[in-house]
UniProtKB/Swiss-Prot annotation:
Residues 3-233 form the ABC transporter domain. It is found in: Cell membrane. It is a peripheral membrane protein. Keywords: ATP-binding, Cell membrane, Ion transport, Iron, Iron transport, Membrane, Nucleotide-binding, Translocase, Transport. This is Fe(3+) ions import ATP-binding protein FbpC. InterPro entries: AAA+_ATPase, ABC_SmlMolc_Importer, ABC_transporter-like_ATP-bd, ABC_transporter-like_CS, Mo/tungstate-bd_C_term_dom, P-loop_NTPase, Transp-assoc_OB_typ2. It catalyses: Fe(3+)(out) + ATP + H2O = Fe(3+)(in) + ADP + phosphate + H(+). The keyword Magnesium does not apply. ATP binds at G35, P36, S37, G38, S39, G40, K41, S42. It holds the Pfam family ABC_tran. The gene is fbpC.
């Protein structure tokens, strides 16, 4: 492993903001740490960089404990959310900053700056003023600066957080391709699920200073570990349930569950795609409370007639019923997950 955190703990005022975290990052792997504000993800990044001392535990990088190694000698690159470019230096001066700190010659600096600006899509921009750059261009310059000294680990703190949505979506694809091409090992933190799932080989979801779940994007999306992870990923159709065989008793009535699901009391997730609309005479009777256009589909918000928790269904625009209509609901077992942990619903 290139990076290992072993029982890493950080306390602020007696409260553990990083609580005995164990995490490994393999060479050439991109890991995104995902979580709400206050979950400990940025503290984790700062601890690896050496900017935040651990109260307990250890950071091991390249097989060496980092206990007494200062930040500038850890061989890591760090890119902050606000980019922190030097306004008094031009683009080339910003990109070359780390190279100068490492004693590179002028010719080495110039060659590396040209190489990286080409790589991040800004050829010939070395003499441009930082003030003339767009937000996306500033992000590219900050990335080039972080990559310039060839860090063994690149760390990104909300790398696309200040950019508009369309630019974020485009750049996250470019970042993924760039890291794959360079073989860069990346540890990134973000609160944006879409960004993490598009960028990462592995997603780590944090809650209250601990790791709630770790897995590939597909694993985490298909099988959230518990109600917290499911709701954080944006799933709202989550209720307490009692599973017996291949069905569960829920506030929505009997709901089918996948074969092999954990039995007894638990928590049930129904993805919106698994809420199938039918004639009002069939299944669970609901009233359409609202519709929300989501681009690729319409989210239909349903209120069951017996005051059970609301449901969200995903429908094609041409099939979406109007608010006020009464519909029936059936459930598709392919989009149902029995979650771990007790229900908070």
């Amino acid at each position: 492993m290139l990076l290992s955190l072993k029982a890493a703990t950080v306390r602020f005022g007696g409260r553990a903001v990083l609580d005995a975290v164990d995490l490994d990052v393999a060479e050439h792997e991109t890991v995104c740490v995902l979580g709400p504000s206050g979950s400990g993800k940025s503290t984790l990044l700062r601890a690896v960089a050496g900017l935040q001392p651990l109260d307990e535990g250890q950071v091991v990088l390249g097989g060496r404990a980092m206990d007494s190694v200062p930040p500038h000698k850890r061989g890591v690159g760090l890119m902050f959310q606000d980019h922190q470019l030097f306004p008094q230096r031009d683009v080339g001066g910003n990109v070359a900053f780390g190279l100068r700190m490492h004693g590179a010659s002028r010719s080495e600096q110039e060659g590396r700056v040209r190489e990286l600006l080409d790589l991040v899509g800004l050829p010939g921009a070395a003499r441009r003023a930082v003030a003339s750059l767009s937000g996306g261009e500033q992000q590219r310059v900050a990335l080039a600066r972080a990559l310039a000294p060839r860090p063994r680990l690149l760390m990104l703190d909300e790398p696309l957080g200040q950019l508009d949505r369309s630019l974020r979506e485009r750049l996250v694809v470019e970042l993924r391709e760039l890291f794959t091409e360079l073989g860069t090992t990346v540890l990134a933190v973000t609160h944006d699920q879409g960004e993490a799932f598009a960028l990462a080989d592995r997603v780590v979801v944090m809650r209250a200073g601990r790791i709630a779940q770790s897995g590939t994007p597909l694993e985490v999306w298909r099988q959230p570990a518990d109600e917290f992870v499911a709701r954080f990923l944006g799933f709202d159709n989550v209720v307490g349930a009692t599973v017996a065989g291949e069905a569960a008793d829920t506030p929505w009535g009997k709901v089918p569950v996948p074969e092999g699901s954990p039995q007894g009391p638990g928590t049930l997730l129904v993805r919106p795609a698994g809420v199938r609309l039918a004639d009002a005479t069939e299944g669970l009777r609901c009233t359409v409370a609202a519709r929300t256009f989501r681009g690729t589909h319409v989210a239909v918000h349903l209120q069951p007639e017996d005051d059970a928790p609301r449901l969200e269904a995903a429908c094609a625009l041409r099939d979406a019923p109007e608010p006020g209509e009464t519909v029936g609901v059936a459930f598709d077992v392919a989009d149902i997950v029995v979650l771990g942990g007790a229900s908070g619903a």
